[in-house]
């Protein structure tokens, strides 16, 4: 992790929600970006991890892979009604000009009565999107449309 040991932090944005996620590896920064996004929706500490989803995605570049990863998790929340609390990215590979991610997301079936959500996220955007290698590892900046 980097930026004084933080997993992520929220930044000021006029209309949407912007955050930066940190990690020692690309895999860790993707995990922490997912955690930051789900903590916008709900307090992830209140969620059990009894439901798992395997995720495999391919994208033309690392930035698109991050957007696709977060968008897939948001899709699973909206369609399968699963809220996630933990993310395990096994690997991110670059091969033949494409990036791929193999990961697992752990959470539980969403129940509005016991788990009221805080903020609805409409979409993950490319606005101000950045993924950079830093002296401490990796940093990703993401803006989500609310």
From Swiss-Prot:
Keywords: Calcium, Metal-binding, tRNA processing. InterPro entries: Archease, Archease_arc, Archease_dom, Archease_dom_sf. One of its GO terms (molecular function) is calcium ion binding. The keyword Ribosomal protein does not apply. GO terms for biological process: tRNA splicing, via endonucleolytic cleavage and ligation. SUPFAM superfamilies: MTH1598-like. It comes from the Archaea. Ca(2+) binds at residues 16, 145-146. Belongs to the archease family. Activates the tRNA-splicing ligase complex by facilitating the enzymatic turnover of catalytic subunit RtcB. Acts by promoting the guanylylation of RtcB, a key intermediate step in tRNA ligation. Can also alter the NTP specificity of RtcB such that ATP, dGTP or ITP is used efficiently. NCBIfam families: PRK00407.1. This is Protein archease. It comes from Methanosarcina barkeri (strain Fusaro / DSM 804). The lineage of its organism: Archaea, Methanobacteriati, Methanobacteriota, Stenosarchaea group, Methanomicrobia.
